[in-house]
Amino acid sequence: MSDKIIEFDHVVAGYSPSRTILNETTLDARKGEITLLIGPNGAGKSTVLKTLFGMLTPRSGEVRFEGKRINGKAPRELLADGIAFVPQGRNRFGPLSGRHNRELGGITLQRGELAGRIDEVLTQFPRIRERIDNQASTMSGGEQKQLEVGRALLL
């Protein structure tokens, strides 16, 4: 069995037919390793992530997660496959409580399973556990980012 968790196999992608950003891009990310995308502005780092997370469909080539082809899958379908994305910046629903923000991350889980997963994830974020019923917009920037990461971990 392969230890590759993410594979790009000769992927071609861009934002218009005349603007190719990824040209025959091949990369592997292996389980248990840390993989960094490093490069100057415009090198394609964000395009790789948008392609991986279903925000951009490759024109050719294959993107695989745990050996399964995921080209063209919508972000919601990728959630069901166990792929979550915590983008830079703040991505919480301010008027909702921390608890409701967390529940949104578990949208693919059954209600009973969701409660158990939320409790499990909250053990990793004790400060968020204390403030889980507060409105997310009243949390500090760091707490909001913890909330977002916790939401992604609910998968």
Protein language model regions, located:
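Conserved structural motif at the start of ABC-family nucleotide-binding domains
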Residues: 6, 21-22
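ABC-type ATPase nucleotide-binding domains, specifically the catalytic core motifs of the NBD
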Residues: 15-17, 35, 73, 98-116, ...
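The feature captures the beta-strand-to-loop junction immediately N-terminal to the Walker
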Residues: 38-40
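Helix-to-loop junction immediately C-terminal to a conserved catalytic motif
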Residues: 53
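Conserved ABC transporter NBD signature motif
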Residues: 61-70, 81, 114-116, 120
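Conserved ABC ATPase signature
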Residues: 135-139, 143
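ABC ATPase C-loop
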Residues: 152-153
